[in-house]
Amino acid sequence: DLIIGNPPYFGMRKSDVESKYYDYFEGRPNIFVLFIILSLEKLNSDGIMSFILPKNFLNCLYYNKMREYIAENYSILVIDECSDDFIETKQETIMFIIQNTAPLNGKNTKYILQQNGYTIFGLEQNISEIKTMYTNSTTLKRMNFTVNVGNVVWNQCKDILTCSKDETLLIYSSDIKDNKLQIKKYNNEEKKNYIKKDGNTGPLLVLNRGYGKGEYKFEYCLIEGGFSYLIENHLICIKYNDEVSDEDLIGLYENIINSLEDERTKKFISLYFGNNAINTTELCNILPIYSTDLNN
């Protein structure tokens, strides 16, 4: 049999979805995933399903379980880009065709990347290039770093914000300019630069994601420490999990910065993420780090 579809694309409340489907997605479900699940349930042996899907189905980590299930149980026949976007959401789209037959002899590998426990789909040419770009690289996870957003939400702790320089410096995303820490004075009188709370004093690499001239770029700052500070939640923090001297840690961070500036990284981001934002999980587990000094 043949199932052809162009399912709708919108988020749903998890409580509106039967619990038996929770194993196929993480977080808030999107209705197109349910269309895939229900269609696969009805697909006969050797039957084919052909769907137009949002392009982020290929690598969004929320859909990793769905991709794992497909990779293990179905043969991928076609993954190709479509010229039309979803009209209402402006989402880029793909043609996704699979067959209800076991994937034999590595047939699916040309469309699949396995990385740090995640299953990623892609166009054949893109997957081939991405696999090549992982050569002689590592990841922040393998280097024993964790990646998270800052843990201070300034407008939820206004009562302990202060202008006193005797307190802990609160670093906002707008304090990072030209990859340097440049403390800004805010017009909003409630948004103050210091906080009455214990802070960190060691080195830390923070990222402020943004776009410049049509291409994705990292805005980063290496905070060398020596003073008390905390990070507001619009910045991403890259934290090392081992005990090393500040000097050695700064060296590790400088190697990461060199990798972020590497032309291979820029090409990888273009191939893998396109115009989509990079979240903390992807930064930690997916983005290759190229400096040979960091390979374990």
Language model segments and positions:
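Polybasic, glycine- and aromatic-enriched phosphate-binding surface used to engage nucleic acids
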Residues: S137-N296
